Amino acid sequence: VKRPSEGINEGKTPAIGDAEARRLLAAPNPETLKGKRDKAILSTFLFHGLRCEELCQLRVKDITSRRGVIHLRVHGKGSKIRFVPAHPTALEAISDYLDMAGHRDDVNGALFRPLK
């Protein structure tokens, strides 16, 4: 029988610090479509804690308003749907990306798309 460890009970994946998160968000070139997309993706990951698959499944229509608060409609594991309040910084990055990409009106399309 093993005794439980007395150390910190953290997950296997280490968390990143504030300084590293700021460096990640500052890295993409804000003048290019790729840079705007990458900043929106990083912001969505960092501010909402989504899994890779959850981010890949996001559609434009998954940005919704509930009771006056903008949410992301996230399709999680086990076909569960949850509504995550959108962080203003991430929402601004997503909006900048959609404005430049020009697919805001394609509501059934993927939110984040590959670039040619």
Outline where the language-model segments fall.
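Conserved catalytic core of the tyrosine transesterase superfamily
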Residues: V1-K116
